């Protein structure tokens, strides 16, 4: 299984011939190396409804006839936009032909904000994602704050690779993400959700170097990890 980082919180997983994308925010993502029209996707996994995580989901899903798996309310909203969806709720998981997807809790907001119309559409509880295929598990934490049940997630799951936000301001900062990495017991940790916008400027190398056991890895956009 291969996981490729594409800037901000965008992750592309390749497993058994399937292309699975998490939070494909590409247009407006200054760090990405790929355009929505160039994406090949079978499945899109969404952590929550903010624009920098939904991103180009609708375009990519329609271009590829891809399945979108998201928290219930967000999946319902996207279904109204003509997208093929499967809803999950926090704590719920499901086996698909490409792997198992389970949503964990996450602590932050989730809404679609229309600046022009001055409207905010509630999109349900935000989530983290546990994705398991080929006997290995990847955890994507979304935009979460640090929370103590990360210890339980680490105890119940053998996490090969964790993508943790470090940007601070809107998510965990590096100090809390360092604690999260210890609690999750992940074999490899990649920092995400940093330096895309001025309020979340961080040094990912300093964070990665601070993790015990050499588990931290900084990926530039387009770089991959094999697990």
Curated annotation (Swiss-Prot):
InterPro entries reported for this sequence: Metallo-B-lactamas, RibonucZ/Hydroxyglut_hydro, UPF0173
Keywords: Hydrolase
Membrane-spanning ranges: none
SMART domains for this protein: Lactamase_B (SM00849)
A Pfam family recorded for this sequence: Lactamase_B_2
GO-annotated molecular function: hydrolase activity
Family named by the database record: Belongs to the UPF0173 family.
Name assigned to this protein: UPF0173 metal-dependent hydrolase BPUM_2573
Organism: Bacillus pumilus (strain SAFR-032)
